[in-house]
Amino acid sequence: MSAMQYYLQTQRADYNVCPYFYEREVKIMEITGIALQTVTAGEDVAFTETAVNGTKCIVHRQGSGIIKLRGITNQCKARFLVSYSGNIQIPTGGTVEAISLAIAVDGEPLQSTRMIVTPAAVENLFNVSAQAYVDVPCGCCSTVAVQNTSTQAIEVQNSNLIAVREA
């Protein structure tokens, strides 16, 4: 039984329940980018498939690298947990050096989510992952993306981004 069904069934004269359950419904979106893609320095990883559709508080345009988190809430803020995992490598012809991705909020990479690897050679795949809480004030919006924070173009494959409304 969902929280909404429970609330509606308990509305009797002798039994009242506060409708705080509206905020507790599960809101989640999962988007992926399975194909190998080249991401230039400072650009966002594109997500081409939607595995789990979001709700009106988590919005994504197919093929875009950005999701929009909306602060639709009766509280002071909405809290989202954003998780990313994927494989990265230096493309053929690239320089062997440290490469990195980071979760970016409103265009600014979060340094605490920076995923750094140093391959021994080009085309060596490494798996990276990070997650961060993002607070969105009531009535506002924030954008979230996964950004290439390296100094060169990198190749990304099997990207998976999950956004979950926590509170």
Predicted regions and their residues:
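Extracellular jelly-roll beta-sandwich "head" domains, especially the C-terminal globular C1q domain
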Residues: M4-A167
